């Protein structure tokens, strides 16, 4: 019998359920523009306090939205930012009608309606993801696809090191000069050099505490960035520097790919697996692209802050004088081949087999024996961990 969980707000939770139930587990992410989420949440808060004026609760609603995105300082806190993009489908919850339509279509797909075919948006994002898989970058894989309004794909790109003669390195190019061959991430290396240079200058000027003043370059850097509570955490601005990498970013690679072939991308839409950084955003604007659709957030990006005049994030209504950046809605690339692969579409006489919800079966069924074994193993592991955490003797006195 299907079981639903109405809220998963940490990546660990979704990863655990996916590990236990495999293909029988589907993570559904509901999207609505920020203003809609804020208004709905403020309305619920007001209603719970027997009030009708939701406006006074906007600040509280904004606080809860930010907390849910990433609850800093808590290892098991809310972290929708790292969970949302791992979904199997993204549904539009802006209104009851759009939500019902999105969820209804997804249910038909998982119950084997092979006459449901990909939308232009799903097709484009799948190509962006396919392009991403070409990358061997040490950080992460990102892909982009530039698409005309009719769905034609005019260019794709991935984040990879450029090679002489144009384009990016392929796996069989000789010599292969991608970053993993050199054994290091050039951006991380230069960030460490920046930190070392800054700390060394502070040391020479006598600005460091005595116990830190005796440390040298590498020791200073490690003291600043290592440990459970480093002075320079991953959220510090200096550790968010991104411009020293050797790889061409996926968005730039797609734009350059079109330029090399003389293909116009004016008025096109770019589908990208992650929100563009501020370096790519300016090229997107300059190239004449009108719309950007993304899946994964990218907190390091300053695009919205730096280009308020030319970029609108989660635009909602159509904008004639700004590039709209909006989240993807539809079947995620991770489920594209599974849910859109054909099953039997006609009978022996050549008649179309139409979808019958009353007789439909799930496309994929998990082995009950296997997931029961996984559940049992997980419960034993959790029980042991809880006993060890609560008893100083590690559970020996239990």
Positions of PLM-derived features:
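A short acidic, amphipathic alpha-helical/loop segment
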Residues: 15-20, 280-283
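N-terminal helicase ATP-binding lobe
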Residues: 1-5, 9, 13
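Short active-site oxyanion
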Residues: 2-3, 26, 267-269
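Terminal amphipathic helices with adjacent charged low-complexity linkers/tails
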Residues: 34, 38-39, 60, 65-66, ...
